[in-house]
Amino acid sequence: MPVGFLGDPLIRLRAIAVAHPDHPLHKLGRKLSHRDLRAHRHLVVRESGTQRTTRALTVEATQRWTVSHLATSVQAARMGYGFAWYPEDAIRDELAQGTLKPLRLREGEVRFAELYLIIAERDDPGPGTLRLARIIREAVKSECPKEMTTAA
């Protein structure tokens, strides 16, 4: 959330570390350390914010591929080019089909990211802002799995 703003939580995303089933990290046959991860290519989706300071789903690695879209990163992981943390909901098909497999980590196997609804002019929002906020809340309530939603 940007500094100086308040917001209402909408969705809590659960992200898991994954790689192709034949990736060398899976072949180690044990829980992985951050040192293990640093020795392999980390796939990262570029942040769209102006400050780009979030490191919620990244780890320092000797090699990193940064791409613009989640789908591109998932495809690279499916092809065995690296590992990444992805929102579990976004890779359900790949997990079910076995094209991606969760990595067993000593720590950090699962990470969470929160999505907030922020209204900049909270004290005096216009009718359009209020309507859009209501539409967003309704869409989250009807389209997102209940376990993901945090909105009242």
Question: Residue locations for each model-derived region?
Answer:
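C-terminal regulatory
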Residues: 2-81, 86-111, 130, 134, ...
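A bilobed periplasmic-binding-protein/Venus flytrap-type ligand-binding module shared by bacterial periplasmic
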Residues: 18-22, 114-125
